[in-house]
């Protein structure tokens, strides 16, 4: 009997399913998911070695990367059994609204949620929301994800 995707995952389990590892895997835990939604938590916004942190701290727009990692994880969970998830990239973000200038000053775990609004084999549209532990909005918006699109490197262009 083949087992389906897990209901919950820790940091190591998430890192095995998304294209980031080590400190660049920002998510700590998969809390819940359905074919259309995902809920993850993270405390990496408080870490001094967060790779997105600048001299000014971890700025609010970095919440988009937290949401993007949740979307990538969701894609791996909904992939057909026995197949690899489609590699993808964020093509655009729209209607983004920030409720905090910095994330590193937020106490408690970030609550990261993404909802699949539409999509097909080559693109997916998600709504995302990042809140603090009390539910205060830190960032929200929509993201268009393009799947299975080869990106030429400068070395291969024109070859």
Model-predicted regions and their roles:
Residues 2-6, 73, 104-107, 113-159:
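HotDog/MaoC-like acyl-thioester-processing domains
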Residues 11-21, 84:
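Short aromatic-glycine motifs in intrinsically disordered, low-complexity regions
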Residues 19-26, 104-110:
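Short coil-to-beta-strand transition motifs
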Residues 22-58:
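Catalytic strand-loop segment that frames the active site of acyl-thioester-processing enzymes
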Residues 27-28, 93, 98, 125, ...:
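Hydrophobic residues on conserved beta-strands that form the core of alpha/beta folds
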Residues 28-31, 99, 115-117, 131:
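Conserved positions in beta-strands of structured domains
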Residues 55-74, 88:
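Compact, glycine-rich, soluble single-domain proteins
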Residues 73-113:
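Hydrophobic beta-strand-centered segment that forms part of the acyl-chain substrate-binding groove
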């Amino acid at each position: 009997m083949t087992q389906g995707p897990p209901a919950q995952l820790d940091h190591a389990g998430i890192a095995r399913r998304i294209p980031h590892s080590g400190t660049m895997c920002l998510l700590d835990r998969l809390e819940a998911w359905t074919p259309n939604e995902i809920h993850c938590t993270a405390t990496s916004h408080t870490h001094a070695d967060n790779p997105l942190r600048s001299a000014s701290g971890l700025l609010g727009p970095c919440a988009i990367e937290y949401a993007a990692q949740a979307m990538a994880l969701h894609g791996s969970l909904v992939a057909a059994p026995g197949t690899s998830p489609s590699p993808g990239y964020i093509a655009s973000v729209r209607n983004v609204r920030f409720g905090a200038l910095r994330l590193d000053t937020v106490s408690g775990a970030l609550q990261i949620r993404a909802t699949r609004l539409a999509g097909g084999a080559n693109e997916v549209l998600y709504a995302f929301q990042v809140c603090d532990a009390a539910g205060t909005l830190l960032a929200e918006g929509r993201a268009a994800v393009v799947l299975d699109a080869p990106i030429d490197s400068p070395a291969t262009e024109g070859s």
